[in-house]
Amino acid sequence: MPAAQHHPSTPDGRYFVVRGRLWRLSNPHLAPDVRQQLVDQLMRARREAGLAVKAGDKEAERRARAAVDAAKHALGERGPVWWDDGAPDYNRRLVANTPYAAWYAALPAGDRD
């Protein structure tokens, strides 16, 4: 099994970076057991989506993708931001086009993806 990839997280803990793009992290204020239940739901929905695609079942795929979206919203990875300081959301934006650009550029090359 390949080693887990490391993706750098922003200093404020709001995002991680994959191929130069910011992705919102889960809400760190979720209770560990709640977070685990939501992650389990997310993984189950992702598996169901993959099976539906392989089976060519468009309705099952739609339901599974809706379940993925619901789990991601509950985790805080989509929808309203989980922080309350009024900072804007840069989810899915290129890090180079955000206030995190200098931080990312300063990372050692081996820490960038």
Question: What function would you assign to each model-found segment?
Answer:
Residues 2-113:
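Extended, charge-rich alpha-helical interface modules
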